[in-house]
Amino acid sequence: ATYKVKLVTPDGPIEFDCPDDVYILDQAEEEGHELPYSCRAGSCSSCAGKVTAGTVDQSDGNFLDDDQMADGFVLTCVAYPKSDVTIETHKEEDLTG
């Protein structure tokens, strides 16, 4: 399946289609968008965002704890869309602060 992904960035929202077997960060880059990242392996917080609508599968990541995920935080480098989804990007400071 392919879902609509909306990323709300400091520069404004961007929208694109993302297959459910492609990481959101990877697809964003394919579409020509630059987003923050570091490890690309789900083990840091550089790419952190916050899901405001929809659901993702980020079971490949291991950096976030259950409480952070329950609060909606997501690592876009290891997140697959599981529905149409809206994510606020550039949330590392909210996560670590």
UniProtKB/Swiss-Prot annotation:
**Cofactor detail note:** Binds 1 [2Fe-2S] cluster.
Q: Which UniProt keywords apply?
A: 2Fe-2S, Chloroplast, Electron transport, Iron, Iron-sulfur, Metal-binding, Plastid, Transport
The biological process GO terms on file are: electron transport chain; ferredoxin metabolic process
Q: Which GO terms describe its cellular component?
A: chloroplast; chloroplast stroma
- Transport keyword on record: yes
Cofactor(s) required, per the database record: [2Fe-2S] cluster
Gene3D superfamilies the record matches? 3.10.20.30
Presence of the UniProt keyword Iron in the record: yes
Disulfide-bonded cysteine pairs: these are: none
Residues noted as binding [2Fe-2S] cluster in the record, renumbered to the chain: C39, C44, C47, C77
Q: Which stretches make up the 2Fe-2S ferredoxin-type domain?
A: 3-93
Principal location listed in the UniProt entry: plastid
Q: Name one GO molecular function term.
A: electron transfer activity
Where does the protein end up?
Answer: Plastid, Chloroplast
Q: Which CDD domains match?
A: fer2 (cd00207)
What does this chain do? Answer: Ferredoxins are iron-sulfur proteins that transfer electrons in a wide variety of metabolic reactions.
Q: What family is it from?
A: Belongs to the 2Fe2S plant-type ferredoxin family.
What is the name of this protein? Ferredoxin
**Gene source species:** Solanum nigrum
Source organism phylogeny: Eukaryota, Viridiplantae, Streptophyta, Embryophyta, Tracheophyta
